[in-house]
Amino acid sequence: QHHGGMQEVIMSTDQAYWQVISLVNKKKLAEGYLKLLQQLDGDVEKMINEGVATKADGLSVRVKVNEAEMTLTKVEDGLSLARMLLCQLCGIDLSSPITLADENMEDIPLLTTDPHFDLSTAYENRPEIRSLELATQIYKQKVNVTRAEHLPSIALMGNYMVTNPSVFNSFENKFKGMWNVGVMVQIPIWHWGEGIYKTRAAKAEARIAQYQLQDAREKIELQVNQAAFKVKEAGKKLVMSSKNMEKAEENLRYATLGFKEGVIATSNVLEAQTAWLSAHSEKIDAQIDVKLTEIYLKKSLGTLK
């Protein structure tokens, strides 16, 4: 029970930790997106003054700038709350300034867990399995004890008694002794029905404990397989999101170049910037998802430390 509670605390703390890392990276992303929009806003303003862009183009960009500022504010507020939650879980004062080890990393270190696993590891480490195995053994012994209480019992007794004077001749002042040997047999004739009932009840309890153990093993096997599947799925999503981000960056680069050359409209640049923001955000989510699925797999195996 202590081991299971400790793993729950570790998992909650890890979740809060990576939530902070996610929001730190999304804050950087929101700041970069806002900077892009502000730069585009300045370029469009110059083009309006030169008569090669309309006020509608300028208004469209300013709306995006305002939206980006609001998004940045929301991310900052969420980051502050996430830091407070992490402090609370770690027993630190909520107002304490903390800097996490992975905050300044460009790419989060990933795939430290092998998705291949041995179910025997989970059976050995999961506390609920150990508890149910112990309960099964106890109920099996209870059957033996209950059966023994209602089986015939035989007792052999013997003693040797020495007296002076002798019990055979009271006038003889000598030590004389004799042996006493007896056999006692106890057969539960009147309570045999009660014994059968109690034995059957004990066997039923033992079978229930065995079924509970089997059910727990099956559920843990399902849980571990689901966690391993999610690890693999998260890895695939990360690969796809990385490719998508590369394409979005290339698209934004061509859109920005075309805009400066005057062959691409402002709306196309805004679309490219939005796609760039979405691709980066998806990659951050995919990286964090990989870390969290690794944690869930370790917990399902009982190896989370």
Predicted regions and their residues:
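Short cytosolic juxtamembrane segments of multi-pass membrane proteins
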Residues: 152, 299-305
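Small/polar (Gly/Ser/Thr/Ala-rich) solvent-exposed segments
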Residues: 1-4, 130, 140, 149-179, ...
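Periplasmic alpha-helical coiled-coil/stalk elements that build and connect Gram-negative outer-membrane
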Residues: 2, 8-121, 227-230, 234, ...
